[in-house]
Amino acid sequence: MIALIGNLSRDLKPGRPPFVGGGPFHGARALQRLRVPARIVARCAGADREALLPPLVRLGTPVRYVPGDATPTFGIAYDGDRREMRVEELGDTWAPSDLPPLPPIGWAHVAPLSRHEFPAETLAALARRCRVSLDGQGLTRVPEVGALRLDANFDPEILRHIWTLKLANEEAEVVGDPAALGVREVIVTHGSRGATLYTRGTRTDVHAHRIDTDPTGAGDAFMAAYVVARNAGFNALGATRRATAVVAAVLARG
């Protein structure tokens, strides 16, 4: 069994009402296709629960709701695969005590929306239960309201507690050489074009057929599929290939 853990977001795009986002939601879109044992641990402000939680629950994976005080809110616009974002509100920070009891799990993917959400001590507590993968947003996104900024001023202690790190292209540019981070598996995703895996001193490109559609959540769907494959016994390269194919199917479905 695997778990997806993170804050739900309230996303704003031109020409449409606010809608649910965040790693738990977009990862659940992949889990809906894979139909494997999994749990989702999701958090948002109590005032937003009725708006944000039902769309997640409808995707079919059992959900554990963690009450929160704030809901991360983003304004989002795309130019092809290039995303422009504005932070309207920051979400809650998770303490170790916020991690609920779960059935035995082999892997958990943690999907922060900003650097402050999952500090090293919380990841350390989770790593005592299972292998942990982390979205690079939890390293590079500066926790402030306004135009989204990235920098490399993260706590390096975080890297000690994770097995796999997923970076988008722009995050990889900020942190530097992925192979030098000291993480067992680093995956750099390239939007709809595939991914690059760094592991055991090797670099492997995994290509995908480009799909002209909104790529929001592609990285979250990728990592949900990746940890499912790793938990099922795939090696890192096999899991990367599997996740690339799953993301293509999820994006094609819309």
List PLM regions with ranges:
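Short beta-strand scaffold segments in enzyme catalytic cores
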Residues: R29, F74-A77, G194-Y198
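Active-site metal-binding loops of divalent metal-dependent hydrolases
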Residues: N7-L8, A221
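Conserved phosphate-binding/catalytic region of the ribokinase-like
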Residues: D177-G254
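Well-ordered beta-strand positions
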Residues: I40, W163-T164, E185
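Conserved N-terminal subdomain of the carbohydrate kinase-like
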Residues: R10-P18, R33-A111, H116, T122-R131
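Alpha-helix C-terminal capping segments
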Residues: A28-P37, A229-N231
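Extreme N-terminal starter segment of soluble prokaryotic enzymes
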Residues: M1-A3
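Conserved beta-alpha-beta core of the PfkB/ribokinase-like small-molecule kinase fold
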Residues: W107-A179
